[in-house]
A protein has these predicted regions:
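Short beta-strand segments
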Residues: 33-66
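Charged, gly/pro-rich active-site loop segments
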Residues: 1-17, 87-164
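Short conserved beta-strand and strand-loop elements enriched in small hydrophobics
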Residues: 38, 80-84
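Compact nucleic-acid interaction/catalytic patches
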Residues: 60-80
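Well-ordered beta-strand positions
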Residues: 52-54, 75, 153
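Anion-coordinating catalytic cores for phosphoryl-, nucleotidyl-, and glycosidic chemistry
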Residues: 18, 27, 69-72, 82
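Short, basic/aromatic recognition patches
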Residues: 9-37
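Short, intrinsically disordered, mixed-charge
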Residues: 31, 75-80, 127-134
């Protein structure tokens, strides 16, 4: 995985004063949230979907039913853009068109890979569950068979913050 910002496919941030370059801070944002939005490419059209996820320090994982539009799109084109943001709000102004968004955001690019290895699939599901609960679960084979686990191998990350 590349270091943040410097090799982002969309280039550097225009506002360098808002860029997050500290990888520890970027990872903290990723770990602190539970929901991310993933953008997929469906032919010539974008497709955006929110998913619950987990982060193992190098990759993101989410789960899904084995069928559906998201799965079909990933099978055709596994390029993914993802967005995770925290500390949302707005900064008021006395001037029209001068209100601003308060946030800390990570946007990344990656490749979506279907996890086929049973041990990795269970590890990923354990990470996702641990993100929401302290309970430990067993996964009946029927549940594992009907659940797709997708790993996003991160290619680039870019962090930005404002008003926080």
């Amino acid at each position: 995985m590349q270091e943040p910002a410097h090799h982002h496919p969309h280039g550097p941030l225009r506002r360098k004063d808002r860029e997050i370059t500290d990888r520890t801070e970027i990872d903290a944002i990723i770990r602190s949230e539970k929901l991310m939005h993933i953008a997929l490419v469906d032919g010539e059209l974008p497709f955006l979907v929110p998913v619950f996820y987990a982060f193992d320090g190098t990759a993101l994982y989410f789960h899904s039913a084995q069928a559906g539009r998201k799965i079909e799109i990933i099978m055709r084109n596994n390029n993914v853009c993802f967005e995770i943001s925290v500390d949302h709000g707005f900064i008021e102004s006395d001037e029209a068109c001068d209100f601003e968004a308060r946030h800390r955001t990570v946007i990344g690019m990656g490749k979506a890979v279907f996890v086929e290895d049973a041990a990795e699939k269970i590890k990923a599901l354990d990470l996702i569950v641990a993100h929401f609960s302290e309970q430990k679960f067993e996964y009946p084979q029927t549940n594992l068979d009907r659940t797709a686990v997708i790993r996003i191998d991160i290619v680039s990350l870019q962090g930005k913050k404002h008003g926080v």
